[in-house]
Amino acid sequence: MRDAVRAKTNRRSVAGMPAELMDLDLRHLHLRIGEGILAARPALIATVLGSCVSVTFHHPSTETGGIFHAMLPTVLGAADGARTPCKYVDAAIETLLGQFARRGIAANDLVVKLFGGAFTMNPEEKQRLRCIVDVGGRNVEVARATLQRFGIEPQSEHILGDRGRKLFFHSGTGEVWVRLLRRTEPPLPSALVCRDDLT
């Protein structure tokens, strides 16, 4: 994750936003695939998940929140793992927990929630391909195992299934709003980077 990079509000971050969130006086950020954000000031962070996984982290007493959007289960054997840790579920969890630890926040003081991991193939291919490649299921499995390794049990989960999700994460309160996507709405393409929004 990079040092404080200020993200700008864009149309993707507010599209499909629940009405009760429109009036909040917060920065609106869009989290792309392979990115992670740690926000020391409250922000409303939106992302769209298919088979990808997001984990939200919230520290209630400091109102610090973090989230990542990972597309692959493990960094093991990945040539770009050091450059793009938030692309991989296991490395993203370790990276965000490391960022909290550098601020004196222990893993067991965080409220953690797990999202995503859908199997979004078309119905005709689902049965034939699920046993071969279920990246979403594997992403969820690795997320749970990695969190467990740090002694963390997710407070809530909205995972698996056959539809993508749009998430809105309030980093100051830890609240997450989820909207299931219609099967015709693909996740949005994006760059593979990590960012750290600390100020």
From Swiss-Prot:
One of its GO terms (molecular function) is protein-glutamine glutaminase activity. It comes from the Bacteria. It catalyses: L-glutaminyl-[protein] + H2O = L-glutamyl-[protein] + NH4(+). Keywords: Chemotaxis, Hydrolase. Its EC number is 3.5.1.44. Pfam families: CheD (PF03975). GO terms for biological process: chemotaxis. Belongs to the CheD family. Probably deamidates glutamine residues to glutamate on methyl-accepting chemotaxis receptors (MCPs), playing an important role in chemotaxis. This is Probable chemoreceptor glutamine deamidase CheD. It comes from Nitratidesulfovibrio vulgaris (strain ATCC 29579 / DSM 644 / CCUG 34227 / NCIMB 8303 / VKM B-1760 / Hildenborough).
